[in-house]
């Protein structure tokens, strides 16, 4: 290590980031906007390529090959941002006492360390789960690209935000799609069932077989005819592809191994600092104020705040009310604020092509909303009315 990367106490000045997803790359960009000279090292198990993750929900209808998703190679990103990149370098552990990141390629000291380790797609524990495909990264898409492009019969497990987007996208390309969920309605973690009725109709009109209230029991190989899929109610079907879209689980192994405080995610304070004063976390791996925030806007705002903190100006993360967009073209939805809870009173305006639904608390104050179909223009005026 050169003397230029050490402070007066002989400790590394380098900011080391573990991970190369959206959170890691957004942080690097935010740091570089503020400081052109700060030493930054990014360590990642993959190539570090830059791509737009939300595009994964629409690759089938757009006929987009996995390679075409890449906007910038990892090496070009590193050159553009003037950082040291260690691609294909899995991190084996962290030694907080010595401020070292341990890898098969050696030990790397840090002044401040940022965990941007992301989250992994959840795979249900059932016979044949190894046959499930996940689409949580460009790399996962590349690994299954051939099977995805050839599949005509597709079962999507999980009717959450990503599952609904995938199902509608694949059905719009002429695939025979089954969308399966244990809950009684799609988007059950986000919305009451009544407000999903237009989306259910749109999915079915697109050709999706929406089957709520039942789960997946097992997947068996069926030589020459894809997979034999058994549902929890005993029904059996043949599928060419089974996709798991039942949510994400933060990657916590490195944080746990380093002795950091974790619950559902890596626990951080308002400055995104972990239980170790020299280690921070950002993105899908983080639990902030009791919440997991697997959306892009909190990551962008978090990266901006964390960059200032890392460079010596502590800047607490502050999140305004944020829109969640469900990109289902036949019936898109946008929502914000509190949209689930038995204490909410809903005021709904419907027409044949859209809806505006306002959630009010027991004091009658607006606390959340959903807009759908052709009513997208109502979202921002309502967003401005939500309490901050």
Residue ranges and their predicted role:
Residues 70, 162, 166-217, 317-325, ...:
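Rossmann-like dinucleotide-binding cores of NAD(P)H-dependent redox enzymes
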Residues 130-149, 225-230, 236-305:
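FAD-site-proximal beta/loop scaffold in flavoenzymes
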Residues 17-18, 108-118, 239-247, 303:
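Short hydrophobic core segments
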Residues 80-95, 207-216:
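A conserved beta-strand/loop element that lines the FAD pocket in flavoprotein oxidoreductases
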Residues 3-83, 169-190:
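Beta1-alpha1 glycine-rich phosphate/pyrophosphate-binding loop at the start
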Residues 117-173:
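Glycine-rich dinucleotide-binding loop and its adjacent helix/turn
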Residues 3-14, 285-378:
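Mid-to-C-terminal Rossmann-like scaffold of FAD/NAD(P)H-dependent oxidoreductases
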Residues 94-108, 220-236:
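Conserved beta-strand-loop-beta-strand element in the redox core of flavoprotein oxidoreductases
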